[in-house]
């Protein structure tokens, strides 16, 4: 029962915290879609070069 007030206070603080969308954008901000796209293209390049990754769908070394 002693934890209930602490839980309620934490819920109230979480609900009143500003969201990520409220933060101002800077020039250094990079959209996440480009980060994920770069990761996919790097992975495609690794698989295309024939590097073994230990599973059957990879190209042979």
Swiss-Prot record:
Main location: secreted
Molecular-function annotations in GO: toxin activity
Tissue expression summary: Expressed by the venom duct.
Cystine connections: 52-61, 53-58
A Pfam family reported for this protein in Swiss-Prot or TrEMBL: Chi-conotoxin
Annotated family: Belongs to the conotoxin T superfamily.
Record-given protein name: Chi-conotoxin CMrX
Organism expressing this protein natively: Conus marmoreus
């Amino acid at each position: 029962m002693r934890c209930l007030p602490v839980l309620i206070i934490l819920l109230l603080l979480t609900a009143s915290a500003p969201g990520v969308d409220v933060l101002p954008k800077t020039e250094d901000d990079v959209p996440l879609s480009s980060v994920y796209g770069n990761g996919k293209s790097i992975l495609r390049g690794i698989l295309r070069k024939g590097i073994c990754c230990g599973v059957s769908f990879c190209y042979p070394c």
